[in-house]
Amino acid sequence: MTSKDPEPRSGFNGTLINLDIQKVQKIFKTMKNTILVFILTLLSTACANMDRRVHPASATSTRGLADTVGFAHLDWQMDSVMHRINRTFPSELLTAGVQPETAWRVAICPHDDYTYTSWHYPSLLKNLKAKTIIVFGVAHKARQFNIADRIVFDTFTHWQGPYKKIKVSAFREEIMAALPNNLFLVSDSLQRIEHSVEGMLPFVQYFNRDVEIISILVPFMSADRMTQIAAPLASSIHRMMARNRLGWGKDVSLLITTDAVHYGDLEWGGKNMAPFGADSSGYAMAVVKEHNIIDSCLVGGLTVDRIRKFVTTTVRPDDYREYQWTWCGRYSVPLGLMVALNLQQETQGKPLNGKLIGYSTSIDHHPLKVDDLRMGKTAIANLRHWVGYASLGYE
């Protein structure tokens, strides 16, 4: 017997072959339709439950690393990076004049390669004292997933850290449970490839080995949509804090991330992002504009009008998915600050005032040496391709 010409099985007398072909076809058609309906029902149920998808209490999963070049991911790397920052940038670390006992309720931090951003991380994050940090991250790849208009959580129980795994706070489920379904979704896929949250965590853990986090990515959304999300999200956070008797700044803080302007006409995916020109004159004008944005929107008393001014400055009025001025955190910053403003009102806390810790660019100082630490650069830095960095704290 061969596979091409098999013998009939024992007892196979040919009677079955002579069955009514139409009847057999009808049976198979019915079975096919039943299976199709079953599959569609499963898919529909899965989509309907997507927003509430969480791991069972007994399951554990660790969010891995998206960038092992620009960021440290091992304990000895972090120790070396901190030693070099302290040795290389002592004046930058002291310029802000923040007292050691200061505890930020809200902080805005860059997330670029350590070789470029260096001193911004410790000068800001050393005053993040809370055990639970709610992070508002950029969703750089949201367009690939067609995600917009809803904040994005994950289901991971831990994130990879240089000293040990970073626990995801159980408060995440409390916050999600209190939110309307149409305001958020869960996407481990988007969270897994997003680098903005990941970049800050080694420094956060350096200063607090027992820190716990909640990662919230903020994709494309209009200012009006931010307002719709911010109020219930702040209420959910406030109720969680009240139930667990937690203090804002002492036990829970908000950490917002953004890099400032992405400028130049080289290696930006074929785009020209140099409205003032890609030379020294254009650089100077761009930096002036940067400080105008920071001073008029972020430094000093936080108000709704100043937050909305940030949106109109960085987001195109005719298409909220597009840049007006290229801060990658054009959604994470205003939404995070709207949540903070609502939370300040709910907690009846003192007004939030932004303090500029520092501003720099990837080309206004010598990069921190990291190439001997199994680290490096993920992008070039020159007049035709540079990035701005602003770090701010709100006490």
Spell out what each predicted region is.
Residues 11-14:
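Residue-identity detector for glycine
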Residues 26-34:
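Positively charged n-region of N-terminal signal peptides that target proteins for export
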Residues 34-43:
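Sec-dependent N-terminal signal peptides
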Residues 50-334, 338, 342, 346-347, ...:
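Active-site histidine-anchored catalytic micro-motif
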Residues 342-344, 348-395:
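Long, Lys/Arg- and hydrophobic-enriched amphipathic alpha-helices
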